Design a protein with these regions (language model features):
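A structural boundary/capping signal
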Residues: 1-167
Length: 167
C-alpha cells in the first residue's frame, strides 16, 4: 500500500467517524469540558480511573485518548502488515505528554496525527520523514523526550509509561 492509501484507511476510521476525546469506564463516558480552560476534574479522572481501552471498544464507542487512538491505528495497520511504532512525547517544561504513532511505508517514516478533536494544525495530515532518526531529531530538537512505548502499553491497565512522566 502507498502512504496515501494507508493514511486514507486510518483517516476513514478516526478522522471521518466523529470520534470524541475522552474515555469509557464501566459504560460511562468521560470527556473534558474545556469551556472554562483546563478541566481539573477530567485530568484527575484520567490519571486515576482511566485504563487503556481495547481498540475494538474505542471503535465501538467512538471515544478515546491519544493512547487509544494510536492503538486503533496500530490495530488497523497490523491488519495490513504495516510496521508501526508508538511513541511517548514528553515536554518537560510544560509537563505534558502525548502518544503518537509512526508507520513505515515506501521506505519512509510517516506520522499522522489522529487524536480526536486535536487542535494541532497538522491534525489529519501526514508528515513524512526520510528515516526514523530524522523524526526523532525533530522532536528532540524541540525539547521533547521521546520514547518508544510500543511494548509498554497494556490494554485494560493504567498507562504507567505515561503516568510515570507526570509524577
Amino acid at each position: 500500500m502507498t502512504i496515501r492509501e494507508i493514511c486514507n484507511v486510518l483517516r476513514t476510521e478516526l478522522y471521518d467517524n466523529g470520534y470524541e476525546y475522552g474515555f469509557v469506564v464501566n459504560g460511562q463516558k468521560y470527556k473534558p469540558n474545556m469551556e472554562n480552560g483546563f478541566d481539573k476534574e477530567y485530568y484527575h479522572l484520567s490519571t486515576t480511573i482511566y485504563c487503556v481501552q481495547d481498540p475494538v471498544t474505542t471503535m465501538k464507542e467512538k471515544i478515546g485518548t491519544c493512547v487509544d487512538a494510536v492503538l486503533v491505528m496500530r490495530w488497523l495497520l497490523n491488519k495490513h502488515n504495516i510496521p508501526s511504532k508508538i511513541w511517548l512525547l514528553y515536554n518537560k517544561q510544560k509537563n505534558k505528554v502525548h502518544t503518537i504513532l509512526t508507520f513505515e511505508a515506501e521506505n519512509k517514516i510517516v506520522y499522522l496525527e489522529l487524536t480526536p478533536q486535536s487542535s494541532k494544525a497538522w491534525y489529519g495530515k501526514e508528515i513524512v520523514y526520510s528515516n526514523e532518526q530524522e523524526f526523532l531529531s525533530e522532536y528532540e530538537t524541540n525539547g521533547y523526550d521521546i520514547s518508544d512505548v510500543t511494548d509498554s502499553i497494556v490494554i485494560g491497565q493504567q498507562p504507567e509509561f505515561l503516568l510515570a512522566k507526570l509524577n
